Amino acid sequence: LSKGWEWVNSNQISCPLYWNYNNKGTIKEFTLHGLYSLIGDAPVCHISYYEASAYAKWADSRLPTEEESEIFLKTINSKNKNLNSSKSIYHASDINLSVNNLWWWTKSHYSSYPGFKPFHEEIEEYNEKFMCGQFVLKGGSVATPSEHIRNTYRNFYEPHQRWMFSGIRLARDVQ
């Protein structure tokens, strides 16, 4: 997390992207529907891997692995066949809506799945250049086509990026 702390300090990060403080101390969030007051139980959106990881540590939790996330998604999808069609604004009390309204960071580094082989050699170079210094995000977002969302669908970004509807899901080890 030392790189994260350096990033926070050098970029003067004090809150998630698109949050705005007014002179009365009120926090508003710029959303797809304009500027709104924060919704207390809504998931935090537009955070970096560094912010997600630091919050998880503060909450005595951790970020899930990609594998744990896929198991979670498989379980949720088996219970709700219409999960992929959910595109409303997120609300924390409805797990089905919170699954694919935000990508969530995992602690897994982006690499190819075991046994993956590209269709063409030209694509191999394209794939490999993205597999350095990036982390996997799972779920999907309000901007993800519903046809793309599945248990194994993944996204990947560098740890400082936070523009892409990124959020957090916490995990804890079973004692």
Model-identified regions with their sequence ranges:
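Functional-site microenvironments in short loops/helix caps that host divalent-cation chemistry
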Residues: 1-151
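Short proline/glycine-enriched turn/loop segments at secondary-structure junctions
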Residues: 125-129, 155-162
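Sequence-pattern detector for short linear motifs
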Residues: 153, 157, 172-175
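Short, structured beta-strand segments at or near domain termini in extracellular proteins/domains
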Residues: 162-175
